[in-house]
Amino acid sequence: MSIKRVISGLIGFPIVALVLIFGNQIVIDIAFAIIAAMSFHEYSHAFKVSDKAKPLTWLGYLACVTIALIHVFPREYLMLIIGAVVPIAILLCFAQILITKMKTTIIDAAVTLFGICYIVIFLMFMPIIRAAENGVFLIWYVM
C-alpha cells in the first residue's frame, strides 16, 4: 500500500466528514460529484495502465456531473433521472462505438458502464440519503 494513499485518506476523510456535518445540500452534492470524478479517474486509469480496456472517460465524468445536479430538479423527478442515467449511458457508449468505426470496443463500453453503475450511481445515493428525513444520522450507516 502506498503511503500517498494513506495520507490522502487521512486528509480526505475529515474533510468529507466536515462537509457532511456542516455543509448545505448544494455543497454536499458538489462534494460527492468531485469524489465520484476522482474515483472514476482512478478506475479508468487502472484499466488504461493495464492495457485491458480504454474506458470512455468523458462519459464517466459526464455521469459524475449528474450528482451535482440531482437536487436542482424537483424531488418527484429524481428517480426518473437516476433511472435514465444507465440507458442514456448505454446509448452514448454504442454511439461512440459506431462513430469511431469500432476503434472503441464493446469491452471499453462494458468497462465504462460498469464504472458508472459501480461508482457513480452508488455515490449518487449518498446526497439523496443525506437530504432525507433524519438523513444526517442515516448517512453514517452508509459511510
Q: PLM features: residue spans?
A:
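Membrane-embedded alpha-helical bundles of polytopic integral membrane proteins
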Residues: S2-M143
